[in-house]
């Protein structure tokens, strides 16, 4: 090994040099011989020991290198270098002494650093092509191979430097820079902020992911209580309603999955999220959502449950208020109702008739049928919803997020279908009127929304549609779900059930 030869020579030479030179890194010591010797190599000038090294090859190289620069330049360089110590390691004591005004005092070199510094100088001279990183690796390996006797000179020199350092800086205290901890803190803070920023989007995406999960997902979502059973749903306890955007975040994190990029993420359980709290963030973010974008995800059937609509469609569908065609838009309008009043209007026309009917009719059954014709085109008319479990199932898929979870609490089996049937306009209409308190600012935007508006009305606009998110809302639906079996019955019951849960469980921020 060519490399080893110089190293072995170095150790011998260093033993000599170390005893002679008080500090291998002392620039003043190095100033003695190097300059007069006229050696043009800068590195050698700074190292007294290196002057003692055999200079066969290095000298030849120096000759060729020196030719490149005029003598005056070389002399100027060596002159400058005389007073400057290039050691990467803590500077020699004297240099430190001169730079005491500098705030940072370097630590004294340890034995390995003494060795590495001297060896790097020597090798850098002899093998200028060596990459510094490779050089360092090799020096480390060699150091490990050295035996105690070979290491002794370096150990002694390091001790001498330490003693000297202590003299020069009696009050010196090693204070490692704490940048890393700061960075970690910053990173944590950044993460937190990122999460807060992400959460609204993440939530939407999660919703998207949610709605696609078909009835199975819905049944899983059923109730906050059952929630734990959800295979997809995050294991969040149902009692986290007050969490801000955090719940969504937490859900994502709990699952240990990256925030949903493609809506594949298991649904965030909005039931645990207080819609009111989410609304501001969400709404602000929602503006970026394109209703058409969501529409593409809608199944041709118009089951709003499809992820694209995120829950907008889901909700609309779940309510069965929006038509299949309308669902995408209505979903959009549900989502966007606050932001984009315009989208709702087109859907509202078909839906509007049901809405008016709904509030007035506690029976809801009769209005239901009238409403059904307009809505049937929409998405499994409400009537169909209640009447046809199969279809409603599909629609239910839409509702999967909304009703299933909440209604399913009670319905569990047919949460989707059942939810729908109860959702049928009749149910909504009776329940809706009571629900249309100020909460439901939505109603203005969504006539048809009125059905959801109780949900949407939650005052959270978008989320309101996802009533299941709001614990208060869930109960509202749950009762409906019960009645789902018998649409007519729910109509009478629904208002009370909804209202009661609303009051009892309403958790407004």
From Swiss-Prot:
Residues 63-103 are annotated as: PQA. There is a cross-link at residue 398 (Glycyl lysine isopeptide (Lys-Gly) (interchain with G-Cter in ubiquitin)). A motif (9aaTAD 2) lies at residues 290-298. Residues 224-307 are annotated as: Transactivation domain (TAM). Residues 394-509 are annotated as: Transactivation domain (TAC). SUPFAM superfamilies: HMG-box. GO terms for cellular component: nucleus; protein-containing complex. Its main location: nucleus. It comes from the Eukaryota. Residues 341-376 have a biased composition (Pro residues). The modification Phosphoserine is found at residues 64, 211. It is found in: Nucleus. Residues 56-67, 160-174 have a biased composition (Basic and acidic residues). Residues 105-173 bind DNA. Residues 30-41 have a biased composition (Low complexity). InterPro entries: HMG_box_dom, HMG_box_dom_sf, Sox_N, SOX_TF. Transcription factor that plays a key role in chondrocytes differentiation and skeletal development. Specifically binds the 5'-ACAAAG-3' DNA motif present in enhancers and super-enhancers and promotes expression of genes important for chondrogenesis, including cartilage matrix protein-coding genes COL2A1, COL4A2, COL9A1, COL11A2 and ACAN, SOX5 and SOX6. Also binds to some promoter regions. Plays a central role in successive steps of chondrocyte differentiation. Homodimer; homodimerization is required for activity. Interacts (via C-terminus) with ZNF219; forming a complex that binds to the COL2A1 promoter and activates COL2A1 expression. Interacts with DDRGK1. Interacts with EP300/p300. Interacts with beta-catenin (CTNNB1); inhibiting CTNNB1 activity by competing with the binding sites of TCF/LEF within CTNNB1. This is Transcription factor SOX-9.
């Amino acid at each position: 090994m060519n490399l080893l030869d110089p190293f072995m020579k170095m150790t011998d030479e260093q033993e000599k040099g170390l005893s002679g030179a008080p500090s291998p890194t002392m620039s003043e010591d190095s100033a003695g011989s190097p300059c007069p010797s006229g050696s043009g190599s800068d590195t050698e000038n700074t190292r007294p020991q290196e002057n003692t090294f055999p200079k066969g090859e290095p000298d030849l190289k120096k000759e060729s290198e020196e030719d490149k620069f005029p003598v005056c330049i070389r002399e100027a360089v060596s002159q400058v270098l005389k007073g400057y110590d290039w050691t990467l390691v803590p500077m020699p004591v004297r240099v430190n002494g001169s730079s005491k005004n500098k705030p940072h005092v370097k630590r004294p070199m340890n034995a390995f650093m003494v060795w590495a510094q001297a060896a790097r100088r020597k090798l850098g001279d002899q093998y200028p092509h060596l990459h510094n990183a490779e050089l360092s690796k090799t020096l480390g390996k060699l150091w490990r191979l050295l035996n105690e006797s070979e290491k002794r000179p370096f150990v002694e020199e390091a001790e001498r430097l330490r003693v000297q350092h202590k003299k020069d800086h009696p009050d010196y205290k090693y204070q490692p820079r704490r940048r890393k901890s700061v960075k970690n803190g910053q990173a944590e803070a950044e993460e937190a902020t990122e999460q807060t920023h992400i959460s609204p989007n993440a939530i939407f995406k999660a919703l998207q992911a949610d709605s696609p999960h078909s009835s199975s997902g819905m049944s899983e979502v059923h109730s906050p209580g059952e929630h734990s059973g959800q295979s997809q749903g995050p294991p969040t306890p149902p009692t986290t309603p007050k969490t801000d955007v955090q719940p969504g975040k937490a859900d994502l994190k709990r699952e240990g999955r990256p925030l949903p990029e493609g809506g594949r993420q298991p649904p965030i359980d909005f039931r645990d999220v207080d819609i009111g709290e989410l609304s501001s963030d969400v709404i602000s973010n929602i503006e970026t959502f394109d209703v058409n974008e969501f529409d593409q995800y809608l199944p041709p059937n118009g089951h709003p449950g499809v992820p694209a609509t995120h829950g907008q469609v889901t909700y609309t569908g779940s309510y069965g208020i929006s038509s299949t065609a309308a669902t995408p838009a209505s979903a959009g309008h549900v989502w966007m109702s606050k932001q984009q009043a315009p989208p709702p209007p087109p859907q509202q026309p078909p839906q509007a008739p049901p809405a008016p009917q709904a509030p007035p009719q506690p029976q809801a059954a009769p209005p239901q049928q009238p409403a059904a014709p307009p809505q049937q085109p929409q998405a499994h008319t409400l009537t169909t919803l209640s009447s046809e479990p199969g279809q409603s199932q599909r629609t239910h898929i839409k509702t999967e997020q909304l009703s299933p979870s909440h209604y399913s609490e009670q319905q569990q089996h047919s949460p989707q279908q059942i939810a729908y049937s109860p959702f049928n306009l009749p149910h909504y209409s009776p329940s809706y009127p009571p629900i249309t308190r100020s909460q439901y600012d939505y109603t203005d935007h969504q006539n048809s929304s009125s059905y959801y508006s109780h949900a949407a009305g939650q005052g959270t606009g978008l989320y309101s549609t996802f009533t299941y998110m709001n614990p208060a809302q869930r109960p509202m639906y749950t009762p409906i779900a019960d009645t789902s079996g018998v649409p007519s019955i729910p109509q009478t019951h629904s208002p009370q059930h909804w209202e009661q849960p609303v009051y009892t469980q309403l958790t407004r921020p």
